[in-house]
């Protein structure tokens, strides 16, 4: 094996000498080197750079000066002594870490010798095995860690804790296998489960090393995924979580789970939104197969930068600290985003020394077959199985997570910096500041453990409500036990629940392959022949989807939806909605108000009343708290819903609310409460909205303040050809600013923004800044339809404000013609129906153009109508393309079902303006 190379190798060697590390401990040399660099690396980088800047290093090149540092400071022990003197905390960390690890290694050597015969008997090792090397796996907890041991013949795993969980799990799998055999459904497989060999020594244990192995046939691939389904059902039943890609290994046709710490998982503090409907949704997410971690759906509080699931995952981005300028005197650490790919959990063929992986999406039916078979056996034998669990699970220890371990890691990385090493109390005090409602005893124990550079660890017995730390001290008394939490769910297992979980399994695996496609086969959109009847039926179906899928809190009259979304890392997630217009309940409210005006009915009125009550209450309760004020994502948009609701239902006007929101605005305050400048979340969207109110002149001063703030924010060197996020939208805000204030400064900025956007002009269209191939888009958010809104609005405002010269007006009309041509030829064929980046948004804009700028063009009018009919026919027969499956939807106005409803109703009602896409709420 090639020897691993390290920076500052002479410092490492000197440290071995300083701590008198013996030669026979070379078997853990790499681990010790990693520990030393992990503790001292930042200090060494700081030290060599300081000496470089002080001209204390000899040599003509950075490499020569690095070698001088190694010879003069590292080899001689000067660097070691300097760390000891300047950073005593780091020295203590180093001493404790090395001593703890060497103590652990020594104990493992003794235990291996003592347990040798039993290890051979259990076939965990072969006869005549001797230890060659050891390697830490995972996190250190109080100086202890899981260790991968390599012998002269094979490998095995040492765990510094009882293996009672592993023993119980193996026994449960054996017990379940007896039911499969009795049912006669698994006799041809002989054994449904691969049981990992273990040797539990009560305070520590030995585990067989499970390595990935190839499969030999497609039948074995099907067997693997069938068994994945079986294990998924078992994990769901036992509240076994954290089954991400690192904890599942593909050993031929056998999936092996190698970490069982989170069995009988018990959520410590379910987030209380003080809102029953959101709590119901949150509980539904946590109490589903999603919580196992095996499915590619983002779980609550997950901080992975991608998909970590145990079935499909292993591809994600993460931030890593890497060495820049290695072996030079200007060496430094830099954080970079690394895209990592892991496939040990995916079955594969060996094909001419190349691995050919069997993707889960091709074996969904096998996964579901295994899940359903196991689930039905559990339901059929519920009391027998419960009796076994009560008897055999008493030895299970459940790991308790008060926080995501990534939060601890962030604090630990900061604490290791020489800059903060003497300020650790302040760093770790953040655990108290951001206490999440945790008690003092918990936080005290967290700080005590993290002070040893360990990830805090807590556990409790399955039948106990006492949460303990690593020292066995009780630090919290829960109201429930892990077994009672399990029992609550176990009692609810039934065929209906199984069918719901199966839908989640199928949806999550298939939809991760093709995001934002809806319908059983995720087919691409193709134009259909539809009718006016399709349009009316579609409106009723979409309104029913919204109303039937609302979650209502009966105790507090709250309402919400469990909506599908996409996280920043491109992972699917379920989420309850905020109050905003863009994808929240205010936006759904606007769509349902349009529907209610079209078809007044008691049920829609009831839903709208609940939405209004929610938004009004939150306005009152949170008006003084820091939050977003933008139109689409903040208070101004929520206000627009309240105003529209009061108009429809003839309630007392809330018009004073807008004045109250804006009264304290200053250009300085806008910099913090409006972090963006664009139409979506910044001043631009608010200016356009207010300027389209009938009484906009009453807000002249407020508009001027927003314009001043926007003027200070914008970057007149950046060209983003976009209405929602870029030049077109911001330029439109300044057009309205000029209309209201007649200030020539705003007109000048408009021209600069327009010219800047045209620097992104292609032969056809404008560059979509998100794309690397310099192509254009047809969407509202980043493309032609949004830019078309801007040009039409400029022409409309120019009729009274006269800010365009004749040549400029001709130019705007020419640009508008090109943008409309893009919409007609390309904007009707995108594989999404939503307002923001789909066909309904494009149709709404194209229809507004035809009615106001080309109203004699009957052919265009008919073409638009046929496209509306086509979308409706397709949606009714093949699925509404805006979510990720026919059972689960994105409900938001700009990205989901409610936006499709909004667009269709406005067509039927013949509303010939841009509506919320302006934004304008009529």
Swiss-Prot record:
Gene3D superfamilies given in the database record: 1.50.10.20
Presence of the UniProt keyword Magnesium in the record: no
Recorded superkingdom: Bacteria
InterPro entries: LANC-like, Lant_dehyd, Lanti_2_LanM
UniProt keyword annotations, A-Z: Antibiotic biosynthesis, Bacteriocin biosynthesis
Any one of the GO BP annotations: peptide modification
Role according to the record: Could be implicated in the processing or the export process of the lantibiotic lacticin 481/lactococcin DR.
Protein name: Lacticin 481/lactococcin biosynthesis protein LcnDR2
Gene name per UniProt: lcnDR2
């Amino acid at each position: 094996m090639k020897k691993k190379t390290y920076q500052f190798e002479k410092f490492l060697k000197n440290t071995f000498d300083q701590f008198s590390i013996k030669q026979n401990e070379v078997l853990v040399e790499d681990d010790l080197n990693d520990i030393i660099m992990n503790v001292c690396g930042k200090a060494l980088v700081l030290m060599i750079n300081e000496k470089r800047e002080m001209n204390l290093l000899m040599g003509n090149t950075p490499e020569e000066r690095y070698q001088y540092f190694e010879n003069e400071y590292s080899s001689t022990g000067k660097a070691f002594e300097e760390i000891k003197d300047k950073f005593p905390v780091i020295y203590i960390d180093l001493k404790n870490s090395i001593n703890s690890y060497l103590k652990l290694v020594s104990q493992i050597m003794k235990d291996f010798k003592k347990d040798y015969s039993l290890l051979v008997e259990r076939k965990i090792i072969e006869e005549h095995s001797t230890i060659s090397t050891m390697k830490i796996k995972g996190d250190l907890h109080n100086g202890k860690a899981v260790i991968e041991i390599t012998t002269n013949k094979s490998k095995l795993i040492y765990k510094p804790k009882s293996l009672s969980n592993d023993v119980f799990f193996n026994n449960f799998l054996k017990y379940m296998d007896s039911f499969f055999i009795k049912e006669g459904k698994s006799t041809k497989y002989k054994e449904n489960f691969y049981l990992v060999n273990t040797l539990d020594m009560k305070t520590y244990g030995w585990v067989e090393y499970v390595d990935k192995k190839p499969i030999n046939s497609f039948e074995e691939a099907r067997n693997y995924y069938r068994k994945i389904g079986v294990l998924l059902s078992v994990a769901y039943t036992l509240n076994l979580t954290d089954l991400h890609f690192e904890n599942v290994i593909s050993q031929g046709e056998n999936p092996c789970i190698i970490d069982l710490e989170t069995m009988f998982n018990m959520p410590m503090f379910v987030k209380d939104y003080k809102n029953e409907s959101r709590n119901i949704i949150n509980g539904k997410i946590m109490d589903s197969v999603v919580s196992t971690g095996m499915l590619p759906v983002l779980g609550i509080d997950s901080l992975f930068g991608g998909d970590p699931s145990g079935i499909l995952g292993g591809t994600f981005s993460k931030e890593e600290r890497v060495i820049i300028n290695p072996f030079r005197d200007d060496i430094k650490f830099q954080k970079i985003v690394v895209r990592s790919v892991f496939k040990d959990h995916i079955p594969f063929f060996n094909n001419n020394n190349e691995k050919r992986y069997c993707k889960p999406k091709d074996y969904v039916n096998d996964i579901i077959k295994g899940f359903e078979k196991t689930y039905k056996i559990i339901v059929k034998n519920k009391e027998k199985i419960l009796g076994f669990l009560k008897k055999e699970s008493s030895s299970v220890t459940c790991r308790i997570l008060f926080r995501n371990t990534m939060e601890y890691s962030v604090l630990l990385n900061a604490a290791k910096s020489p800059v903060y090493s003497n300020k650790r109390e302040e760093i770790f005090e953040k655990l108290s500041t951001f206490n999440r409602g945790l008690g003092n005893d918990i936080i005290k124990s967290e700080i005590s453990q993290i002070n040893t550079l360990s990830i805090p660890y807590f556990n409790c017995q399955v039948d106990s409500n006492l949460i303990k730390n690593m020292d066995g001290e009780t630090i919290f008394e829960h109201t429930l036990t892990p077994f009672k939490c399990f029992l609550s769910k176990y009692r609810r297992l039934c065929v209906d629940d199984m069918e719901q979980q199966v839908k989640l399994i199928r949806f999550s695996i298939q939809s991760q392959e093709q995001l934002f496609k809806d319908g059983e086969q995720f087919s691409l959109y193709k134009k259909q022949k539809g009718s006016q009847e399709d349009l009316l039926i579609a409106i009723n179906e979409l309104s029913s989807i919204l109303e039937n899928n609302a979650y209502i809190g009966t105790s507090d009259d709250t309402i919400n939806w469990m909506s599908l979304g996409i996280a920043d890392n491109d992972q699917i997630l379920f989420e309850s909605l905020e109050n905003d217009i863009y994808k929240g309940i205010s936006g759904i409210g606007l769509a349902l108000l349009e529907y209610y005006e079209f078809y007044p009915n008691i049920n829609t009125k009831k839903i709208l009343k609940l939405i209004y009550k929610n938004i009004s209450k939150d306005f009152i309760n949170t008006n003084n708290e820091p939050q977003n004020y933008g139109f689409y994502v903040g208070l101004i948009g929520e206000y627009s819903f309240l105003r529209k609701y009061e108009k429809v239902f003839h309630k007392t006007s809330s018009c004073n609310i807008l004045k109250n929101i804006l009264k304290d605005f200053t250009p300085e305050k806008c910099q913090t409460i409006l972090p963006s400048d664009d139409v979506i979340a910044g001043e631009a969207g608010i200016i356009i909205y207010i300027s389209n109110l009938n009484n906009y002149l009453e807000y002249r001063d407020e508009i001027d303040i927003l314009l001043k703030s926007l003027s200070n924010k914008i970057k007149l060197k950046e060209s983003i050809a976009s209405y929602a996020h870029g030049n077109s939208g911001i330029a439109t805000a300044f057009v309205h600013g000029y209309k209201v204030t007649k200030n020539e400064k705003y007109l000048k900025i408009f021209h600069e923004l327009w010219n800047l956007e045209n620097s992104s002009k292609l032969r056809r269209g404008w560059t979509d800044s998100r794309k690397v191939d310099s192509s254009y888009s047809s969407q509202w958010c980043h493309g032609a339809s949004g830019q078309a809104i801007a040009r039409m609005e400029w022409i409309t405002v120019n009729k009274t404000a006269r800010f365009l010269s004749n040549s400029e007006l001709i130019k705007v009309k020419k640009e508008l013609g090109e943008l409309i041509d893009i919409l007609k030829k390309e904007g009707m064929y995108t594989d999404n129906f939503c307002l923001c980046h789909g066909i309904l948004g494009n149709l709404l804009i194209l229809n507004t153009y035809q009615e106001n700028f080309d109203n004699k063009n009957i052919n265009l009018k008919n073409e638009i109508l046929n496209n509306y009919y086509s979308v409706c026919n397709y949606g009714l027969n093949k699925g509404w393309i805006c979510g990720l499956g026919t059972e689960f939807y994105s409900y938001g106005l700009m990205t989901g079902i409610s936006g499709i409803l909004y667009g269709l109703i406005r067509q039927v009602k013949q509303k010939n303006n841009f509506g919320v896409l302006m934004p304008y709420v009529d």
